[in-house]
UniProtKB/Swiss-Prot annotation:
Binds directly to 23S rRNA. The L1 stalk is quite mobile in the ribosome, and is involved in E site tRNA release. It comes from Leptospira borgpetersenii serovar Hardjo-bovis (strain L550). This is Large ribosomal subunit protein uL1. SUPFAM superfamilies: Ribosomal protein L1 (SSF56808). GO terms for cellular component: large ribosomal subunit. Keywords: Repressor, Ribonucleoprotein, Ribosomal protein, RNA-binding, rRNA-binding, Translation regulation, tRNA-binding. GO terms for molecular function: rRNA binding; structural constituent of ribosome; tRNA binding. One of its GO terms (biological process) is translation.
Length: 230
């Protein structure tokens, strides 16, 4: 991929052979962002485990990720009032199921009560493809719809590694204070280490980097980050 002059000039600010502590990495990564909009600060970390399909869960970022999350809730009766009061943008039962079945997916997260899952499950080809299918392990199949909506709105994100074993997550915006970004990142590390499979051997997090949406990736001293976060 061809890189522009702006990127090449910014890349010279970062020593690609060096591993930085997390405070330095966040400061450097933010300084290389060259978007006209408020870009996202992202982390990438490679997990050391053979059964990648077992690595997944949710992380509640203390300062959110700066993203407005439009939540849809499939539920009935009084639960609909609870979901609306919590701030869900779209609330309904069979009416919403029919709308989504028609191809509408103009929302970012989806919650369902257990009694709705028989019908919601039929939307698998649509919701599954976009990563929107409610799941008990992710806390999005629940009777406490208000709690689920609040957590999604306040920055709870779902994680899973890609085929190469790398977990990618947005942890805030370039406009965030450095301290808030660092705290969000430390929360990611704490959660990943807490969720580490019991039979994982050696260093669980092999590499770690921080980068803006458009900018330069900065390598982090992963051992120091883990040791100072847990």
């Amino acid at each position: 991929m061809q890189r522009g002059k702006k990127y090449k000039a910014l890349k010279e600010k970062v020593d690609s052979t060096k591993f930085f502590n997390i405070d330095q990495a966040v400061e450097l990564a933010k300084s290389t962002s060259y978007t006209k909009f408020d870009g996202t600060v992202e982390i990438a970390t490679k997990v050391n485990y053979k059964s990648l399909q077992n690595i997944r869960g949710t992380i509640s970022l203390p300062h959110g990720n700066g993203k407005k999350v439009r939540v849809l809730v499939f539920c009935k009766g009084d639960k609909q009032n609870d979901a609306k009061a919590a701030g869900a943008e779209f609330v309904g039962d069979m009416d919403l199921i029919e709308k989504v079945a028609g191809g509408w997916t103009d929302f970012d997260a989806c919650v369902a009560t257990p009694d709705m899952m028989k019908d919601v499950g039929k939307l698998g080809p649509i919701l599954g493809r976009k990563g929107l299918m409610p799941k008990p392990k992710a806390g999005t199949v629940t009777t406490d719809v208000a709690k689920a909506v609040n957590e999604l709105k306040s920055g709870r994100v779902e994680y899973r590694p890609d085929k190469g074993g790398v977990v990618h997550l947005g942890v805030g915006k370039v406009s965030f204070d450095n301290a808030k970004l660092v705290e969000n990142i430390r929360t990611v590390v704490q959660t990943l280490m807490r969720d580490k499979p019991s039979d994982a051997k050696g260093d669980y997090l092999k590499t770690f980097s921080v980068s803006p949406t458009m900018g330069v990736g900065v390598k982090v001293d992963v051992k120091e980050l883990v040791n100072t976060s847990i």
